[in-house]
Curated annotation (Swiss-Prot):
Cross-link (Glycyl lysine isopeptide (Lys-Gly) (interchain with G-Cter in SUMO2)): 286, 362, 511
Protein's name according to its UniProt entry: E3 ubiquitin-protein ligase RNF169
Post-translational modification: Phosphorylated by DYRK1A; phosphorylation increases RNF169 ability to block accumulation of TP53BP1 at the DSB sites.
Assembly with partners or alone: Interacts with DYRK1B.
Gene that produces this protein: RNF169
Position of sequence motif LR motif: 689-701
In-chain residues carrying the UniProt-annotated modification Phosphoserine: 12, 247, 249, 339, 368, 403, 409, 485, 644, 693
Recorded catalytic activity of this chain's protein: S-ubiquitinyl-[E2 ubiquitin-conjugating enzyme]-L-cysteine + [acceptor protein]-L-lysine = [E2 ubiquitin-conjugating enzyme]-L-cysteine + N(6)-ubiquitinyl-[acceptor protein]-L-lysine
Effect upon mutating residue 68 to S: Does not affect recruitment to DSBs nor ability to inhibit DSBs repair
Region annotation (Disordered) ranges: 1-71, 96-169, 195-262, 491-555
Extent of Low complexity compositional bias: 1-20, 33-53, 148-167
Gene source species: Homo sapiens (Human)
Biased composition (Basic and acidic residues): 132-147, 195-243
InterPro entries per the UniProt record, alphabetical: RNF168/RNF169_E3_ubiq-ligase, Znf_RING, Znf_RING/FYVE/PHD, Znf_RING_CS
């Protein structure tokens, strides 16, 4: 290895590249000819003496194989390419900088990493290749190694040499990942730990498997013992609470006394009758099922006798005061279906002995076509619907079973309801609830905002509500003392018929008042106790039709008839007007007086000026004449007063003048009372928030604000 540095090698490589290849080859040929004694190219022909092949040294490698692929010179610092060729440092630098192919020999472009490696860190490879080239061709590498000084001089004689020594083996120590046997030791230790854990868990699992069956057997044995101890008590309790428990089928024997709640369909036949406990007044008795239409009285009697004898000691005597069926609605006129039995017969029976209860016979449903029951024909084909609820009864904390009180409805014969009365023996609470429901329905009907399709006469003017509602919707009542010119007398108004009162129980309570008020045949008082019931669609029309059957056919009577029919619909006042102020007259409102076009009063005055104003329609079905409500109300009131003044209701007649003054005074008093009532209600609804009062606003504290 020469001692010259890299700069010397680079300069020698540049100088060698500058020389002509041909001149160098010529000089090499001349030198070889001088050594062998052969003439040069300028001399004449001569024989070439070859050495024997045994003494001939091995041929050196071709320069294309060992030299640079670019300049064909033995590289001092070679760079290996991926294709197998080598380049000197200069050619490798030019190949890396150029955009062309990487290898000038095979035109194979190396990858980027190869080019970067050849450019940057190809020092080690170049040294190895240079050492190989110097060993293989020492004669050709010596002038370049010596700086080119001996290149022009004669070359030393080539001596035969032995085969080139093989390059030294470069040993590189392998990377040690682990020591020998270390992985096996680690695996063995992990396996031992796993086996130890399994050995520790195995005894506990075995113990658990042993204890589980024992615990299960112990729990089952305790449950069986508890069940055996409780079974007699349950049987005893069931027998006490349901002594008349019957089987669900006629072919089965009665059950052992256990109250197994069966949820059957509503159309399944039930053979249970009312239990004795329910008839004895116990609230925890079982609710009975309805009877089937196809069952006969004999079969029910047999099943009842079959279930009763074991429970004779449990029956107690019953008094009428302890009877809990007072809330059940009864009908004394119509026949009953089996789903709603007639309990009035059972109320009259003495409950002191069991034999009377065993022989109790419920009325069978009539199957004849002349039956009063309106649904009997349908129920001949279908089984009756079970009236009792299918949900199990509620159990009280003390263990008693609370059975709900069932109100059974009764089908009514609608053909007979118009001729005969039907009395309801019900509790006052139910009657009060009925009346409340009727009033609520009437209020909803009156306050409805729906568009009217027909103008019923003054149907929207009636309201059931507070005084404020009365003040905005009602019209004051006017009594006009008119005597018919023909001398005819109106028939006495006796109120709604008994058939109409069947639909309204609260009206039947006030019949005595109506009968006491209707004293003379010339007076028609205004019935005002139950306004919502008297005005109900078809019943109202039948009312008007019945109450005027006794009237004559004269025009005056017809006019009075229309006035009376209108007066009967204004029934929202809670008292009847004094009898002394209504002397044989017909009650009308101021609004209804406008509808009279021609009406002869007693003094002969013809009322014609009333026909100038049109008939006002319902409030809900027409537009308001004024933009604001209070102006319209005040305007209508002024118009009414002007109209009454224009008509001049016989100023010479003291009775009419006194009547009008009294009505005006009553109207003013009523308006004042309503205004005061509204002020009082407003003050009562207004909450005083002043400081110091009970309802004052409390300041929000900081902690409450922070919490939010």
């Amino acid at each position: 290895m020469a001692a010259a540095g890299p700069s010397t090698r680079a300069s020698s490589a540049a100088a060698a590249a500058a020389l002509s290849r041909r001149g160098r080859r010529g000089r090499c040929d001349e030198t070889a000819a001088a050594k062998t004694g052969a003439p040069g190219p300028a001399s004449g022909p001569s024989l070439l003496v070859l050495s024997p092949p045994l003494l001939q040294p091995p041929l050196p490698p071709r320069p294309e194989e060992s030299g640079c692929a670019g300049c064909l010179e033995p590289p001092g610092e070679a760079a290996a390419l991926p294709c197998g060729h080598s380049l000197c440092r200069g050619c490798a630098q030019r190949a890396a900088d150029a955009a062309g192919p990487g290898c000038p020999r095979c035109r194979a472009r190396g990858p980027g990493w190869a080019r970067r490696r050849a450019r940057d860190d190809g020092q080690a490879d170049s040294e190895v290749l240079g050492e190989c080239a110097r060993r293989s061709q020492p004669e050709r590498c010596r002038p370049r190694r010596d700086g080119g000084a001996a290149a022009a001089g004669p070359r030393p004689e080539q001596e035969p040499r032995a085969a080139p020594a093989e390059p030294d083996f470069i040993f590189r120590a392998p990377i040690k990942l682990s020591k020998p046997g270390e992985l096996r030791e680690e695996y063995e230790s992990l396996r031992k730990l796993r086996e130890e854990k399994l050995q520790e868990e195995k005894p506990s699992e075995d113990q658990i498997h042993k204890l589980l069956p024992e615990d299960t057997e112990t729990g089952k044995r305790k449950m069986d013992e508890q069940k055996k101890r409780d079974e007699p008590l349950v049987l005893k309790t069931n027998l006490e609470r349901c002594p008349a428990r019957l089987s669900d089928s006629e072919n089965e024997e009665p059950s052992r006394g256990q109250m197994t709640q069966t949820h059957r369909s509503a159309f399944v036949s039930k053979n249970n009758s009312y239990s004795l406990a329910f008839l004895a007044g116990k609230l925890n008795s079982k609710v009975e099922r309805s009877q089937s239409c196809s069952d006969t009285a004999q079969e029910r009697a047999k099943s009842r006798v079959r279930a009763v004898p074991g429970n004779k000691a449990k029956v107690t005597t019953m008094t009428p005061a302890s009877n809990p069926i007072i809330g059940v609605l009864l009908s004394t006129q119509n026949n009953r279906c089996v789903s709603a039995p007639d309990l009035t017969i059972e109320k009259r029976l003495p409950f002191s002995s069991l034999s009377s209860l065993a022989s109790l016979h419920k009325p069978e449903r009539s199957v004849s076509p002349e039956s009063n029951d309106s649904i009997s024909e349908e129920l001949n084909h279908f089984k009756p619907i079970v009236c009792s609820p299918c949900t199990p009864p509620k159990r009280l904390p003390d263990g008693r079973v609370l059975s709900p009180l069932i109100i059974k409805s009764t089908p009514r014969n609608l053909n007979r309801s118009l001729q005969k009365q039907t009395s309801y023996e019900a509790s006052p609470r139910i009657l009060k609830k009925w009346e409340q429901i009727f009033q609520e329905r009437q209020i909803k009907k009156t306050l409805s905002k729906a568009t009217l399709t027909s103008l019923a006469p003054e149907m929207g003017e009636e309201l059931l509500g507070s005084e404020g509602i009365h003040s905005s919707k009602e019209k004051p009542l006017v009594a006009v003392n008119t005597r018919l010119s023909g001398g005819q007398v109106l028939s006495e108004y006796t109120g709604p018929t008994s058939a109409d009162l069947d639909h309204f129980p609260s009206v039947s309570q006030t019949k005595a008042e109506q009968d006491s008020d209707n004293k003379s045949s010339t007076e028609i008082p205004l019935e005002t106790c139950c306004s919502s019931e008297l005005k109900g669609g078809g019943s109202g029309t039948s009312l008007e039709r019945e109450q005027f059957e006794g009237l004559g056919s004269t025009p005056d009577a017809k006019l009075d008839k229309t006035c009376i029919s209108r007066a009967m619909k204004i029934t929202t006042v809670n008292s009847v007007l004094p009898q002394n102020s209504v002397l044989g007259g017909v009650l009308k409102t101021k609004q209804q007086l406008k509808t009279l076009n021609h009406f002869d009063l007693t003094n002969g005055v013809l009322v014609e000026s009333l026909s100038e104003e049109p008939l006002p329609s319902l409030r809900r079905g027409r537009k308001r004449h004024c933009k604001t409500k209070h102006l319209e109300q005040n305007g209508s009131l002024k118009k009414l007063r002007q109209t009454s003044g224009e008509v001049g209701l016989a100023p010479t007649d003291p009775v009419l003048r006194e009547m009008e003054q009294k009505l005006q005074q009553e109207e003013e008093d009523r308006q004042l009372a309503l205004q005061l009532q509204r002020m009082f209600d407003n003050e009562r609804r207004t909450v005083s928030r002043r400081k110091g009062s009970v309802d004052q606003y409390l300041l929000r504290s900081s902690n409450m604000a922070g919490a939010k």
